[in-house]
């Protein structure tokens, strides 16, 4: 099947819910926010939970329902805190926008309340100094500006900020919810996706609906309307399951040379070792033939190797270390001594 003609619009945006009530699998959040929207009197808000569960979508839907398309750009400031997270941004861009007062005239049937909204995406990556500076800005301009903080880890938001917000937890999306949404997009775009491919997409996206939709669009552009599990794995960067199982099998052989050869093959094929470690962890944890004590030793080494990779260590040496420790754990050999 020939690839589909590329669309200029990402499907993540094309199929993003425009109203709060359309956000999937967040019934409690939707119920509370729908009631709050009827009065248009919103507090500062803090949305937290795993990626791809609808946090940003909900914030944008609230803003759109309050102001409509005409006033949206002048009343809403969106900032990705991963890029704009320093104290200077708080002192200039955010403060300047927050300080401007606005009217409350209804326009086009939208409530248009007398305040603006600042949406800070990935707020948990803001520096502590920037968050402290933001606290003062929130207090000073609370009558004319509302802040929406969006983060994955609420523990990284300082308590003085978190205590000033209404907190909403976004639950991880179930496989059924993700599958229903993906099948809806497939029907709209004329795609054919069998049950195995659908299960694969759910697995490689790890409950992140945004990531799943992106993988689906990438596969459609490259492989056409009929998409297989192999197609999805190739566009996602996930490592084929047989590669991960081959590494474990080489470790189970008890032969270091066999494991070393498998490690060399993995490095030569260019697979990212950090991704391999993540998938290897899943295989180890779910293995029925490995005792818990041995699993614990292997998982400890996987965590250490992952940390070393983040710090810039050599991929080959780290993967070889993982393989050798896995052999020692599987055959109850003594652990290596660290001096």
Curated annotation (Swiss-Prot):
InterPro entries attached here? AAA+_ATPase, ATPase_AAA_core, DNA_pol3_clamp-load_cplx_C, DNA_Rep/Repair_Clamp_Loader, P-loop_NTPase, Rep_factorC_C, RFC_lid
Show the CDD domains listed in the entry. AAA, HLD_clamp_RFC
One Gene Ontology cellular component: DNA replication factor C complex
According to the lineage, what is the superkingdom?
A: Eukaryota
Q: Where are the transmembrane segments?
A: none
Q: What is its main location?
A: nucleus
Tissue and organ distribution: Expressed in roots, leaves, shoot apical meristem (SAM), flag leaves and panicles.
Pfam families, sorted: AAA (PF00004), RCF1-5-like_lid (PF21960), Rep_fac_C (PF08542)
Q: Where in the cell is it found?
A: Nucleus
A single MF term (Gene Ontology): DNA binding
User: Which SMART domains would you find in this protein's record?
Assistant: AAA
A biological-process GO annotation:
DNA-templated DNA replication
- Induction (free text): Down-regulated by sucrose starvation.
Q: Which UniProt keywords apply?
A: ATP-binding, DNA replication, Nucleotide-binding, Nucleus
Where does this protein hold ATP?
Answer: 48-55
* NCBIfam families, per database record: PRK00440.1
What is the documented function of this protein? May be involved in DNA replication and thus regulate cell proliferation.
Q: How does it assemble?
A: Heterotetramer of subunits RFC2, RFC3, RFC4 and RFC5 that can form a complex with RFC1.
Q: Which family does it belong to?
A: Belongs to the activator 1 small subunits family.
Q: Which PANTHER family match?
A: REPLICATION FACTOR C / DNA POLYMERASE III GAMMA-TAU SUBUNIT (PTHR11669), REPLICATION FACTOR C SUBUNIT 4 (PTHR11669:SF20)
- Please identify the protein, giving its name as recorded: Replication factor C subunit 2
From what organism does this protein derive? Oryza sativa subsp. japonica (Rice)
